[in-house]
């Protein structure tokens, strides 16, 4: 299954929330990303069907491939954030971009 940028964003967000909170629910993801619960439910379903996520007792878990992709996206995000900060962009803005 082809993973689009939005799917990558969801996987990265799940990874970040797991690192921060340990366990992640759909409602946590909705709050973090600023999306509606139905939008998150749809995306979770697509990612689950693609083999990137599993859901167990209401908690989201990255599969091996989902985690690999999320880690790559997160590393890329950190690299570009650092480049923006070095270029003089405020850290808060660099994190958002």
Residue ranges: model-predicted function:
Residues 78-97:
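Amphipathic alpha-helical dimerization/coiled-coil segments
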Residues 2-35:
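N-terminal helix-turn-helix DNA-binding core of bacterial DNA-binding proteins
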Residues 48-58:
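A short, conserved structural fragment
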Residues 20-22, 75, 86:
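Helix-turn-helix/winged-helix DNA-binding modules
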Residues 10, 29, 40-48:
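Basic amphipathic alpha-helical segments that dock to polyanions
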Residues 32, 49-50, 86:
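Residues at alpha-helix termini
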Residues 14, 51, 88:
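Conserved functional loop/turn residues at catalytic and ligand-binding sites
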Residues 58-76:
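Basic, amphipathic "hinge/linker" alpha-helix immediately C-terminal to the N-terminal HTH DNA-binding motif
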